[in-house]
Amino acid sequence: MASGGGGCSASERLPPPFPGMDPESEGAAGASEPEAGDSDTEGEDIFTGAAAATKPQSPKKTTSLFPIKNGSKENGIHEDQDQEPQDLFADATVELSLDSTQNNQKTMPGKTLTSHSPQEATNSPKPQPSYEELEEEEQEDQFDLTVGITDPEKIGDGMNAYVAYKVTTQTSLPMFRSRQFAVKRRFSDFLGLYEKLSEKHSQNGFIVPPPPEKSLIGMTKVKVGKEDSSSAEFLEKRRAALERYLQRIVNHPTMLQDPDVREFLEKEELPRAVGTQALSGAGLLKMFNKATDAVSKMTIKMNESDIWFEEKLQEVECEEQRLRKLHAVVETLVNHRKELALNTALFAKSLAMLGSSEDNTALSRALSQLAEVEEKIEQLHQEQANNDSFLLAELLSDYIRLLAIVRAAFDQRMKTWQRWQDAQATLQKKRESEARLLWANKPDKLQQAKDEITEWESRVTQYERDFERISTVVRKEVTRFEKEKSKDFKNHVMKYLETLLHSQQQLAKYWEAFLPEAKAIS
């Protein structure tokens, strides 16, 4: 685009006529210099002054402006297109000026319009989908599939024992062999499923729900210990956590289509999952890779071009810290409520002993009734402690792990960006090497240098596409994750409030029933 100096007018700097310009246009240019400041018709409308302002816009300009307007939107936010024509053209001028600023072209808005041809406009990047569109897509991704995990069964004896769970699936989707089926799975099978899904989908920016954490102490008690309340509580927690994990997997449209998921749900016997033990060779290798990734992450300094990702990553990191603090407080609450239940039971026993030794019949009966009330209250405290743990603590624990996976998706996007930047740097070095060969007049090595440049140009293009694709996936995944998180927290908090309300109502009934006994003491 030919552009004059900052103080130069169109009449002082005339560009040469375009090759396809007809003689009549050249004659008009010679007769009226102010109107021939630019041979482009879009530029004419800008520089002709007041006379051109009243001139109606041609359909050609409208066609060239709409793609530029759509392509210049950032962060997936679209404006309504039900605007008047003059507003559209004014908005397009502003957007094109912003684009020219990003291209380091310090020109006037009118000349910015001249710099964009209809062909360039059609090649503009596709607009990002809006959050409303993403939510509509997620509403369409509702699948009629429910999974349940029941009947934890200990198989074997000693340290070789393991627990098998019954996985039941109910669905009307045609991809499955029947509407209802059940298989037996052990904990390592769930870990193996996660490893397979993570290996395939995490590198593309997908948020793969993580399984519950291993518990060496809990499983040791189950394997070698007797069946007691602590072992039963551990198995119930793990069963519920595995059910939530598997339900999140099948609720994800991409994960559900994965053949490993269908095999996990349908196949009677699975090959033994290897590398799931923490002290195995594969487990140690994973720990080493995680440490290496952490170090490499510290060395990457990404120049973020989209403020959405920067702000969202800060929100995720801050939320993870707050959830960890809240989880610690809830765990303390659970322990205190269990201690309260234990002390209430001791209090009830002491009251019963006191009532049995009391000579006053009315007082003895009242103390015995009070002991029974305290025993019922002890049961309420124990139930509420379990509700605190299952409905709050476990939910927070799930989302602490999920937020770590969300951060990993951002990290994977950063790695993809770094690979793109490294390829650009390598391409620049190859071009510099070619220039040195040209300068040194070494034609024998010049062809190889050109081939390498062609190869790295294709790599740069591919890596740029990979970065754009993973950015789109991460944006969509985070939007979906936040929506699911809101629904999940709402459901669990409502259930938790219902348990609290029920507990308080029962407590009031117990005391109301005991009140006549207390008044009857003479």
Curated annotation (Swiss-Prot):
Phosphothreonine: modified positions: 41, 48
SUPFAM superfamilies found in the cross-reference section: BAR/IMD domain-like, PX domain
Boundaries of every BAR domain copy:
302-522
- Region spans: Membrane-binding amphipathic helix: 281-298
Residues with PTM N6-acetyllysine: 237
Residues modified as Phosphoserine are 32, 39, 58, 72, 188, 280
Stretches of Polar residues bias are at 55-65, 98-125
Q: Where is this region: Disordered?
A: 1-144
- Its membrane topology, per UniProt? Peripheral membrane protein
Q: Which GO terms describe its cellular component?
A: cytosol; dendritic spine; early endosome; early endosome membrane; endosome; endosome membrane; extrinsic component of postsynaptic endosome membrane; Golgi apparatus
Locate the residues binding a 1,2-diacyl-sn-glycero-3-phospho-(1D-myo-inositol-3-phosphate).
186, 188, 214, 238
Look up keyword Transmembrane helix and say if it applies: no
Q: Where is the composition biased (Basic and acidic residues)?
A: 71-80
Phenotype upon knockout is:
No visible phenotype. Mice are born at the expected Mendelian ratio and are fertile. Mice lacking both Snx1 and Snx2 die during embryonic development, around 9.5 and 11.5 dpc.
Pfam families attached here? PX, Sorting_nexin, Vps5
Q: Name one GO molecular function term.
A: phosphatidylinositol binding
Please give the subunit comment from the record: Predominantly forms heterodimers with BAR domain-containing sorting nexins SNX5, SNX6 and SNX32. Can self-associate to form homodimers. The heterodimers are proposed to self-assemble into helical arrays on the membrane to stabilize and expand local membrane curvature underlying endosomal tubule formation.
Q: What else is known?
A: Binds phosphatidylinositol 3-phosphate (PtdIns-(3)P) and phosphatidylinositol 3,5-bisphosphate (PtdIns-(3,5)P2) in liposome-based assays. Can bind PtdIns(3,4,5)P3 in protein:lipid overlay assays, but not in liposome-based assays.
Q: What does UniProt say about this protein's domains?
A: The BAR domain is able to sense membrane curvature upon dimerization. Membrane remodeling seems to implicate insertion of a N-terminal amphipathic helix (AH) in the membrane.
Protein name per UniProt: Sorting nexin-1
- Species source reads Mus musculus (Mouse)
